[in-house]
Amino acid sequence: MNTSHKTLKTIAILGQPNVGKSSLFNRLARERIAITSDFAGTTRDINKRKIALNGHEVELLDTGGMAKDALLSKEIKALNLKAAQMSDLILYVVDGKSIPSDEDLKLFREVFKTNPNCFLVINKIDNDKEKERAYAFSSFGMPKSFNISVSHNRGISTLIDAILSALDLNQIIEQDLDADILESLENNAPKEEIKEEEIIQVGIIGRVNVGKSSLLNALTKKERSLVSSVAGTTIDPIDETILIGDQKICFVDTAGIRHRGKILGIEKYALERTQKALEKSHIALLVLDVSAPFVELDEKISSLADKHSLGIILILNKWDIRYAPYEEIMATLKRKFRFLEYAPIITTSCLKTHHIDEIKHKIIEVYECFSKRIPTSLLNSVINQATQKHPLPSDGGKLVKVYYATQFATKPPQISLIMNRPKALHFSYKRYLINTLRKEFNFLGTPLILNAKDKKSAQQN
């Protein structure tokens, strides 16, 4: 049956350059169509695509950035506003990591005036700690705003549900769609879409010349990454995907990080690219060269994994020529990397491919812990037992208690304690609870984020 008689609902994605419009377009389309880049203004034409949102066919428009000083800005702006006028719903995307400018607000109001059927989508809110940044956009006065992170796939399902509701598509049952539409959607869907979110993203980090590229080659059994005795032969992150059983793992070999100090030119570019690669990673393989003693820079680099809340595995490379006995190295490791005490340790010689299969299987094990969700009843049972065993210290003589606990996110696991006096939760008691949860539920190689909230804050979130 021909479907041309059906009028599709149209969604336009608008906003300034480099806020993540094309990335959101690709995420909703579940296919890499628009070119995404770190450079502002990459999309200059309107990309149009028929997509399926939870089985409902809609038309999605990705437009060029609307910055005042962008190339062909007048033409692009006119085209954007025309797309806004013709659309059933606008997703106006802003960068949650930036402070909104007067230009942001001016452009948004112009779009809203053209078509008030508009959602404010605050992108790059990568974790719960960054929600506070979204409050800066309250001046936009939008009751319908959504905190998302396209790169971390956070908040996307909530946004899709709201889109379907706004377009009155929630009540349409699948049987009402023409059979040929369903067949078309099924046939045109990229074959790897179903498992797209199951690809484990692994960043390989470490100092220059510790063996990161050799490790990548050993893991993938390819000479994809240039290996040389010359320090710093990898500049751009190099990625390679392998399959272990049914599980896809994408490795990114990042540029080696040199000594501290002023970094200019291509090294600055390499460091920025490394940071970008880690933003998209689930797990970091921290490669340490044990042919010589650890240095301060090793600790600095390890903090990158902590900064991005990644799962982590410590890879002790060049073990066959280690500088000291096993006991001495492990004692030094425990002392210098105390904050990574939950990370598994694997010794290897990448050039000789020792223990490479162990690394692969450990990645899957850590990712399972990284993605773990604890049933609420079980979580509260453990928290209750812990607080009974060691009661919470009082706050100036006033009782401090936990009403309940809830896990609100995974990758990494994030848990909220709903309390009567959240500010009274001392860091040492928080550490006690985290250690208790680790012992009970096995969060191998995984950061565990625990925060305290009062009932009012919990209800608002």
Swiss-Prot record:
GO terms for molecular function: GTP binding; ribosome binding. Residues 372-456 form the KH-like domain. PROSITE patterns: G_ENGA. It holds the Pfam family KH_dom-like. One of its GO terms (biological process) is ribosome biogenesis. CDD domains: EngA1, EngA2. Keywords: GTP-binding, Nucleotide-binding, Repeat, Ribosome biogenesis. InterPro entries: G_ENGA, GTP-bd, GTPase_Der, KH_dom-like, KH_dom-like_a/b, P-loop_NTPase, Small_GTP-bd. Transmembrane segments: none annotated. GTP 2 binds at residues 206-213, 253-257, 317-320. SUPFAM superfamilies: P-loop containing nucleoside triphosphate hydrolases. GTP 1 binds at residues 15-22, 62-66, 123-126. Residues 9-171, 200-371 form the EngA-type G domain. PANTHER family: GTPASE DER (PTHR43834:SF6). Associates with the 50S ribosomal subunit. GTPase that plays an essential role in the late steps of ribosome biogenesis. Belongs to the TRAFAC class TrmE-Era-EngA-EngB-Septin-like GTPase superfamily. EngA (Der) GTPase family. HAMAP family: GTPase_Der. This is GTPase Der. It comes from Helicobacter pylori (strain Shi470). The gene is der.
